[in-house]
Amino acid sequence: MKSKWKLFFSCYFAFFVNGAMVLLVGAILPYLIEEAGISYSVAGGLLSAFAIGNLLASFVNPPLAGKIGRKATIVSMSALIPLMWLIITWIPPVPVLYAAFVLLGIGRGSVSIINNAVVNDNSDGKPAALNLLHMTFAVGAFLSPFLTSLY
């Protein structure tokens, strides 16, 4: 039971951070528009690129997990998230921004897919564990604006 709680806690924490990260995408757009001098349509395209990446995770993740395993997949796909945020902070040319937002979405979607699978596989068919997983995402998304306003 203790090892299951440890496993679930890491999934819950990852979903909390994932929820907070998703709201950051919208929060940074006004600054990105100003600093990079991009139009609202390009900024909207970046949001679409993020959503497309999230969708692409459904196609990238299963074969990758089958080839290298879940653990290596979650580590490599999770590593995309801070790496893409770092690239975005450098305010590269727009095509690079689009690619970074797609890869950011793939990383976010992969975290979601694998955490859902791990919790589902280890919850003995009880929905409470998955409900709690998605609640932690919502709490992270809710608290994100408050946490970012501290800085």
Predicted segments, located by residue:
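Intracellular juxtamembrane helix-capping segments at the cytosolic ends
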Residues: G109-S123
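Juxtamembrane helix-start elements in MFS-like secondary transporters
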Residues: L29, I38-L47, L130
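Small-residue (Gly/Pro/Ala) motifs that create kinks and tight helix-helix packing interfaces
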Residues: L29, N61, G140-Y151
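Glycine-rich segments within core transmembrane alpha-helices of 12-TM secondary carriers
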Residues: K126-F146
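Hydrophobic core of transmembrane alpha-helices in multi-pass small-molecule transporters
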Residues: M84, P95-S110
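Conserved MFS/SLC helix-loop-helix module at the cytosolic interface between two early adjacent transmembrane helices
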Residues: L56-P95
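Residue-level signature of mid-helix packing/kink "hotspots" within the transmembrane helices
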Residues: L23, F50-F59, A141-F142
